[in-house]
Amino acid sequence: MSEYRLVMKGVVKTFPGVKALDHAQLELRPGKVMALMGENGAGKSTLMKCMFGIYKMDEGEIEYEGEKVTIPTPLDALNRGIAMVHQELQPIPARTVAENIWLGRYPTKKIGPITIVDHSKMYADTDALLKKLKLQINSHAKLGSLS
């Protein structure tokens, strides 16, 4: 087993007229809390979006649990257990409390060859979370209806 859960090596990402990442490196150990810090425009969000499959790296590689992997989409990242909280995240008033909590990472189930959102699990898990946090909020309530 690798010392690191996730390693990003030599990551290069360019946008028109801007080299956002110039051979960036990242090593994450299992069971450790890490902070990725830097000035505005340093490339922190760009690196995370490359890790999560939102941006395609121009160069570089990702190793996950000691194996070289390709993460072309956020769904591929989620299937590997990699998640990301986006700094631009905005709540959606027309969706329920549960839908906002699980936005972009809904629990799913298979019905034959089709994968669908597992609404029962989503609401049950949300209710358990709200209870644990001692919040008396209806998980089915539209976010815009709350004050």
Residue ranges and their predicted role:
Residues M1-S147:
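Glycine-rich phosphate-binding loops of nucleotide-dependent enzymes
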